[in-house]
Amino acid sequence: MPELPEVETVARTLAPQVCGRRIVGITVLNAGTWQGGTAADEVKSLTPRIRGISRRGKLLLLHFGEGGPDASGYEEEISVPTSAEQWPLFYSASGMEQGRLELEGEKPETVTGLAFHLRMTGRLFVWPQGTAPGTHTRVIFDLDDGRRLFFDDTRKFGQVRALCGRELDKWNFWRELGPEPLEMIPEAFASRFSSRKAVKALLLDQSVLAGVGNIYADESLFRAGIRPGSRGCDIAPERLRSLHKALTDVLLLSIRECGSSIRDYRTARGDVGAFQNSFFVYGRAGELCRTCGTRLESARVAGRATVFCPKCQQD
């Protein structure tokens, strides 16, 4: 499943292609993909202009609105800050901007954007005018310049949802999302781990932190030297602050590498990520630790396959 770095990368590679364009047509090819109480035809009737793109947890958000530059001819890929202090971010036709775009309009029924949950195999690609949908295309968005934005999803677990005040109030997943790890100070981060649950289970819990999945939980715990099954409440505050730094570092490193491509993930330009080449533990059970040479072990933590080094991760 695409995690925070992968969704962030899709956002920054999609923005130069679609920001400033209007959506003039929507075709839903798989009814189960379009979720919520606002129909696709209702969104299409607005011919909304894509003002910007942002991310919340593992969700990619298209924001509607007037004003700002047009995306015509803008092909530069947006660079990403290397410091967590520069977040939150959103991407527009003029490039990368700081701040947060609002999703709730003055009226609860005002549609202010779209949310894409990529889940296991969701992808977003822009194609030339007249391109026919593929076998796994679930929703087509026709843009005012003739190009087409396809939401492809092999497994059909992904979702698209129109956003407005009335929808956000009813969407439990949205209301329960925890804070963004790249926007937290170490003390606030550490305070989220007072539970008796395993620290990895807490990292994966989207109500504790938004956007972290199996890859970056394993990688950050290794870098912090913490055993995945350790109870959150048993870990000293200074160790949790180390985990905060490790998680921040690994997320930013992965974003700079355009995420991790293991099976299905691609950027919005069709490129593969490269961070999988830097894994210390994820997917490497039985191999030798790159730090100490000990054979890596595997276990089930929070119902997920987990890889760790028994020597480097002692807590």
What is the role of each PLM region?
Residues 2, 6, 181, 239:
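Catalytic cores of large soluble enzymes that bind and process phosphate-bearing ligands
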Residues 1-158:
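Gly/Gly-Pro- and Ser/Thr-rich, intrinsically disordered tail segments characteristic of DNA damage-repair
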Residues 22-48, 54, 59, 66, ...:
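Basic, nucleic-acid-binding surfaces and adjacent catalytic neighborhoods in DNA/RNA-processing proteins
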Residues 91, 99-223, 231:
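Phosphate/anion-contacting hairpin/loop surfaces
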